[in-house]
Each structure stands twice: as C-alpha cells, then as structure tokens.
C-alpha cells in the first residue's frame, strides 16, 4: 500500500507532507507484519522530495523495521511499459536477525534482477480485436476536440516516442505545451500510463498508428493485466483505474 503520489511525480514537493504516510506507519506498527511493501512514484527519490524518502526510511526504523527503497522499471520485469516506481521494503528487525539479512546486503537480496529483454508496445497489443464502437468513439472524440490539432503533428509508428513539445515543433508550439501528449514508438515499451488515459485528456498515450487514445483492452495489455480482468465504470473511469495501478508482473 501507500499514500497519494501526485505531488512527487514531477520531483517537486507541494502540499503538506503530513499526510497518509503516517497513517500507514501507524497501521504497520499495530499489525507488526514481518515484511511491508510500499510503492510510490520515482520522483520521491529526487530533489526536494528526497527528504520525504528519508523520512519514510526513518519512520520504519522508529517502529522496529529496517527499510530500503529502490526505483524499479516495470519493463524490466515483463510489462510492456516503461513504468518507474519506487518500492520500499521494510523487514521487522527480529526477522532480519532470524534469516540472516543485514542492512548491507538487504538491497541485493530483496530486489530481483532485471529480465534480459523488455517487451514492446507492438508485441503487447497488435493482435487485439477491439470493439469497433469503442475505437470509433475514441477517433470521433479526437476529431471533435482540441486534441486533433496536436496529435496530427506526430507521425505514425515513430522510432522514438514523440510529443508536440519536441524541438522540431517549436515554431508551431513555442510554449512547448502538450508535453504529456505522446505518440509512442511501437517497438519500445509503452510510456508510463497515467490517469490521463481518459479520452477527454489532452495528455496521455495515443495509439502508435491511429489518432486515438488506447482502448481499454489495449490499456489492460500494456499494464500486464489478464484480458479477462474486469473493470467497472465508463471508459474514462476504467482508463483512470488502469493508470493508477501497480503493474502486476512487477509485483510478482
């Protein structure tokens, strides 16, 4: 588990950090689990947010745990998505002693080695048979929205991920806006999915060969979910829920 992560996504601390983390520590202290795993955005390890990272480690120490945190990329563990997240692992001190783990070797024992090859977006979604009505709904939405102007700048099937804020579009887009609207490269892992997978958002990942956002089936594949995984709500609610998930294959 963990608390909300948005305020550290861009390596900047906003809001009051006296938040759900301390409730998480309180519950951990009461439950006294042998091992606790927490997940947060990679930005928590950088810049001003690093102080919060250290407070997390020290907070676990105060309740009798040794904790480490490390940024992992879901693409290194079988997920067709470059999704970096910081995983904290806290082990109760008596358990550390029983199994012969100490702080010096904790990192190397706990975190798995990356796989040799990262799966690509094309490999993940090219065989999907989408609902034609859902595809058309997404295409129609772009044609009738502000997205159309920007996504049509970006070539299909690019060799690298493309954005309207790329330098070559500086004359058209001098403010370098729409920096989170992405035409992904099909032969690389997909960029990080966020709640911006909603059809209404100006940011988020579009299809590599079509002027639309990814369908729910495609989003599930990119997150590493089974095809028969059930999501509730309308399109935007389902897309948002996928974007907020921890990649299952990474956790496995």
PLM region descriptions:
Residues 140-252:
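C-terminal target-recognition/interaction regions appended to catalytic cores
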Residues 1-182:
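Class I S-adenosyl-L-methionine
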